[in-house]
Amino acid sequence: QKWTAEGELLMTLGTPGKPAEKMSGNPFNMPTDVSVATDGTLYISDGYGNARIHHYTATGELIKSWGEPGDGPGQFLIPHSLCLDKTGNVYVADRENSRIQVFTADGQFVREWKGEHRPAHIWQGPDGNMYVAELGFRQGLTLDSSLYPEQPSPHEVSHPSGVKILTPLGQWLGGWGMSTDTPGDIIAGHAMAMDSKGDLYVGETLDGARVQKYARVG
């Protein structure tokens, strides 16, 4: 839904209470994120009940959709977040495939970054770098059997959550977070936002249940 800053409803996409059939590819079944391009068009990750990215005009007309369940290029297992860079490329946090996929504005696959720990949110900062919040894995975690028919052993899923900073090409620049409740560490990073000063706000789910602010230095 689109609202004014005063809370007036301007536009609704989809029909509230009537989701599309699960994994049908049709909008929407539990969408996860939306990003607005410089031309006003909308990109929506339709992630929890679909494996799809939808591109809409500023007035709500569907332009194109792409994606299907799987782990190949252009396939997704919970596309949980997306953002656009300054050239219009679309970065998708493909959470349960533990990777970031990059597409052109019209949905053509460009590249992928592997090795993320269940990336839940991606954001481009004013410095041009990409910030990725990782939900992470932990010992004893049971994964969705519909996505992982063969459950990994606990030692295979004991990767901490945190925030990574990468270039737009996926080169690692830094990061932090050790899955503890110590202030500054991150438990299950789930969403992020950045203010005009470049300060970063990270929302944590599961045992975290808090929002932490990180001030930009330099």
Q: Language-model segments: what does each one mean?
A:
Residues Q1-G218:
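Eukaryotic scaffold repeat domains enriched in small/polar residues
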